[in-house]
Amino acid sequence: MEFLVKSVRPETLKTATLVLAVGEGRKLGASAKAVDDATGGAISAVLKRGDLAGKVGQTLLLQSLPNLKAERVLLVGAGKERELGDRQYRKLASAVLSTLKGLAGADAALALGDLAVKGRGAHAKARLLVETLADGLYVFDRYKSQKAEPLKLKKLTLLADKADSAAVEQGSKEAQAIANGMALTRDLGNLPPNVCHPTFLGEQAKGLAKEFKSLKVEVLDEKKLRELGMGSFLAVAQGSDQPPRLIILQYNGAKKDQAPHVLVGKGITFDTGGISLKPGLGMDEMKFDMCGAASVFGTFRAVLELQLPINLVGLLACAENMPSGGATRPGDIVTTMSGQTVEILNTDAEGRLVLCDALTYAERFKPQSVIDIATLTGACIVALGSNTSGLMGNNEALVRQLLKAGEFADDRAWQLPLFDEYQEQLDSPFADIANIGGPKAGTITAGCFLSRFAKKYHWAHLDIAGTAWISGGKDKGATGRPVPLLTQYLLERAK
């Protein structure tokens, strides 16, 4: 889809479909009022008949209005004045896209810039709008015999006042990069586990480096992981025929002496639970257990498209967790790269076992910040549901920056505590630390475990177990989160 920004009067624009917003109580914004005047009150007449109440997301298509160059006018409800928030604005945008998909026109122009969205300026409104539209175009039909019909709609133009055009252009540019990153994240998450395994992800990283010459990629194999002393990482993979991989992405958009930000992604390409086997019902969704790594891929794609002036490192800890005669057993003790020993009480708490060695590896980059992203605990879904990611960290400034980024990007997180009292739940009589802390506060104790390996830098942990994918039903699939949050965090660091 091509997105353009133009500063023209809506009533003079030649387009297949002109989109205008109408509020409840027949409220017309400046754009809708200008078109209404040009058509001799045609819009007002329709509204007086009660054909459109103006509730958020309601639509009404008008054909061949007089004195317009637009072939059609699509009216969309914007709700009550001064009550339009981010979610309602996204709902409005989705309703517009749904209608446009069913039309024959190859282009459309959206005159929505005069809508007041609470707490949002021209840049943020454009970003929300374009991101919603672009993400709404996503289709995954790679394995369908009958593909989705090609979309007739090819071009969307955002109409903006001249004073706002630069801000709208920038918002649209950022949104397209974020949406492309989300699409990559969703593609990788939606792939079946017989295709998307650690070696495959290494190949995908090299493919991304071919597309973007500013990206450097290194893939560490099992032999190298053993040389590095990553006993915890290797323990997760030893039950599978698929060898593990640590994928290293490096982008240098700033001076070489500027410390990088590091993103660490959990990449369990299929999680059976290992010897601590999961129930069979719903196990197919454990292909999404690599969505942390997929979100690092997606964030890198967005950063590479935007060519942000930052240095960024990605560490993707990729393995498959399978039961076999050679698999790790409950009760096994392993030595991590840090030298700390871990008693593995539950092989289904494997994400933290690959992440802890990756977090130790991150030390060599002397980072400004390290953020790990993982579908780590079912307890996070119990605590926060599927709307909000869990967030913990050892530096309050970093945590606040991520919370702020999530609010701006409409990809929110919520902070959970890392009090010392929770650390006691991880005590082991046989090793330095146990890999689980009992049934209480499971998300927090998982964060506490990781914190033991992140003491040499500012670190935060995002638990995306509830937000990385939609479970079951017709909308089942990866969401692309938290690419918007992470990209916004990095955009702020690039300023």
UniProtKB/Swiss-Prot annotation:
Domain of life per record: Bacteria
Active site, renumbered: 278, 352
Cofactor(s) recorded in Swiss-Prot or TrEMBL: Mn(2+)
Biological process terms in GO annotation: proteolysis
Residues given in the record as Mn(2+) 1 binding sites: 271, 348, 350
Organism for this UniProt entry: Pseudomonas aeruginosa (strain UCBPP-PA14)
Similarity-based family: Belongs to the peptidase M17 family.
Chief place where the protein resides: cytoplasm
Protein's UniProt keywords contain Aminoacyl-tRNA synthetase: no
Assigned keywords, A-Z: Aminopeptidase, Cytoplasm, Hydrolase, Manganese, Metal-binding, Protease
NCBIfam families for this protein: PRK00913.1-2, PRK00913.1-4, PRK00913.2-4
Name listed for the protein in its UniProt record: Probable cytosol aminopeptidase
Job description of the protein: Presumably involved in the processing and regular turnover of intracellular proteins. Catalyzes the removal of unsubstituted N-terminal amino acids from various peptides.
Lineage: Bacteria, Pseudomonadati, Pseudomonadota, Gammaproteobacteria, Pseudomonadales
Enzyme superclass (EC): hydrolase
InterPro entries the UniProt entry points to: Leucine_aapep/pepB, Macro_dom-like, Peptidase_M17_C, Peptidase_M17_leu_NH2_pept, Peptidase_M17_N
